[in-house]
Amino acid sequence: IIEPNSSIKGLFDENMDIIFANQSLYYIPLKELKQNILEFYELLNTGGILFATMMSKKNYYFSHSQKEEKNGLSKVEINGRLNETSFIHFIDKAEDLENLFQPFETLFLGDYDPINFYNFEGSAHHYIYIGIKK
């Protein structure tokens, strides 16, 4: 079992060709997130790919967030259909991912915002980062 905000070092006996981190990394405090990114780099074979998504400030969660704390997370409180309290690391623009995901070499920066015909709360915008271990 992985403890919250813990190292993943030593969990795997073999290296990998791809790491897929979809809608999960933005809950990790910045210091630990950077540590995990370095561990991802170590876990990948040369030529291995990291696919990751991060929540953007265009996402409706940001409009419910408080000031960013020293650990890089902002408290988010949502009431209504979604009733939750989260702590999220928001990304301002896609280019910010290049610095965050160093030492990976960037292959692709993009974004997505799932279509929601009913638009319950607002945008679900996320940024996409794809990088390679050289």
Predicted ranges, named:
Residues 1-11, 35, 49-134:
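Class I (Rossmann-like) S-adenosyl-L-methionine-dependent methyltransferase catalytic domain
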Residues 20:
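A conserved beta-strand element that flanks and buttresses the S-adenosyl-L-methionine
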Residues 23-27:
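Short catalytic micro-motifs in class I SAM-dependent methyltransferases
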Residues 34-46:
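A short glycine-rich, Lys/Arg-flanked "PGG" loop and its adjoining helix->strand segment in the class I
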